[in-house]
């Protein structure tokens, strides 16, 4: 896996979050060396104090895919 690449993507997402009026946090979900889902902090734009980058990513990914067992995934944030 390319940890540096995935962290750079998370950093880019954190910058995007700040540009969108949120706190600067981003998250990247990876499986088998491939990015499968990304998210940025959306606490302010969604008016939801729980919608941090990581929690929002997990909520959206699991809801969209029906997958709840994430042990084969790596989360970068």
Regions inferred by a protein language model and the residue ranges of each:
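Active-site phosphate/pyrophosphate-handling residues
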Residues: 5, 34, 56
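Small-residue (primarily alanine) positions within well-ordered alpha-helices
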Residues: 10, 14-17, 27, 53, ...
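Short, basic/aromatic recognition patches
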Residues: 2-22
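Short, basic and Ser/Thr-rich N-terminal targeting/leader segments
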Residues: 21-25, 71
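Short beta-strand scaffold segments in enzyme catalytic cores
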Residues: 25-33
């Amino acid at each position: 896996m390319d940890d540096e690449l995935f962290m750079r993507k998370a950093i880019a997402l954190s910058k995007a979050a700040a540009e969108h009026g949120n706190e600067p946090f981003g998250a990247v979900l990876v499986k088998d060396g491939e990015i499968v889902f990304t998210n940025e902090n959306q606490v302010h734009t969604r008016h939801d104090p729980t919608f941090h980058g990581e929690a929002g990513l997990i909520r959206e990914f699991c809801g969209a895919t029906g997958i709840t067992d994430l042990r084969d995934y790596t989360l970068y944030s």
